[in-house]
Amino acid sequence: MPSISIGETHAPLGARSRDAKAVSRRVIKAACYMAIGLLAGGLLPNAGARADGGTSVGDLTLRAAIDRALSADPSLKAGAIEVEAAAGRTLQAGLRPNPQASIEVEDSIGTGGYRGFRRTQTTLQISQLFELGGKLDRRVEAAIAASNVVRADRELLRLDVMARTTEAFVKLLGAQRRLSIAEARAKRTATLIPALRRRVEAGASPTIEVTRGQVAADMAKIEAGRARAALDTARRSLAAQWGLAPPDFAHVAGDLDTVGPPPALETIIAGLDDNPRLARWNSVRSAREADVRVQRSLAAPDLTIGIGPRHYAESNDAGVVFSLSMPIPVSNRNQGNIIEAHRELAKTGEERGAARLDLYRELSAAYGELAESWAEISQLRGTVLPAARDALGGVQAGYGQGRFGVIDVLDAQGTLNEAELRYGEALVAYHAAVAKIEGLTARPLSPPGPSARSE
């Protein structure tokens, strides 16, 4: 972590702005890495391909969703205004005190010989306060450092908006997948009813099987309706990221199926210090170091110099008056503010350490979710789903031959449906965890290898 001496020797003003540039570079890099990771994961398609393989004019990509959210978020607009306000404070900090004009009339409107204005002495004086101890430079440094913190905070807001939008986007992709699964189940169950009626009419099955099949078909329709309602909610949630109601898009375009094994946790933790939330503390440290120098400079007394003509009414003569004034720092040498500034600086490292610990906790939790979802995906994709599909195919074939009943068919359909739903939920959890980890570390996870893509 770069540090600046607390003493009088200090870096030039240009060096103070490097912290903001460093933080901005980290934030831009984090945003780029997030996009790269999502491209590798299939969430940022180059064309509007729906999750179910079709296309639609109303499809929305993640990139477009993030652009909308960034352009419409009120907190970002307020942050931009705050950056402008900080620029005004920096400008004000570099302004010198204005000169003062004063007029002084003596020996007038008195008694005796001083009655009226016959013996009046009139002095017109211009005085200027000269700030000593490098106050102006220290003040400008502090204002620039404070502006860097404001910029860093605004960039963090950008990352938060991107993270929220990505999370809503992934959830909407999952909702689209859930609806597709529910509609497929409803279609499979509905096609079973005519076959059941024919078997009952032929005397091959009891009448109760038609009732059971109809109940299953109705339940599948209800589930499809629930999935459709959940999809509408997820769509509105995404549109709410840029304040749009109702949504003006039909679907979001992305591919949840492109996944791969996560790297080791130690590899991920190695990038934790690149997180912009930690980089912000470099700007905070610089701002507090600058405040220490400001408070030290305020201990130096300022000098006020005045000069001006004096007119003597009695003799009609004129003279010049010079004045010098300076406070004597006997008791107040700004000791309290200097101590406060030093203590504020001293706690910066601990605050950064606490922030890093919080990030580590978040990263560990996100990695746990990633590892858990990957394990579930691997098992579902490798054994459970193929077995469930084979079982359904075998039961359906056996049902046509009279070897299985309708309950067997419905059970096999339900098992496959449950496995497909669990698989979709695991994919959503996987991509949500990836997005969170990439936001925390400001770097992409290793993209899935060829074996992962081909599974």
Question: Model-flagged regions — what are they?
Answer:
Residues 52-58, 102-135, 139, 249-263, ...:
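Small/polar, glycine/serine/threonine/aspartate-rich low-complexity segments that form flexible
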Residues 64-70, 205, 209-210, 214, ...:
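Amphipathic alpha-helical coiled-coil scaffold segments and their short linker/junction regions
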Residues 2-4, 10, 15, 21-23, ...:
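Acidic, low-complexity, intrinsically disordered peripheral segments
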Residues 3-5, 154-274, 366-369, 373, ...:
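Periplasmic alpha-helical coiled-coil/stalk elements that build and connect Gram-negative outer-membrane
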Residues 31-42:
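Bacterial N-terminal signal peptides
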Residues 78-90, 157, 161-182, 191-194, ...:
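Amphipathic alpha-helical coiled-coil segments
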Residues 67-77, 84-98, 113-116, 124-141, ...:
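A glycine-/polar-enriched beta->alpha junction
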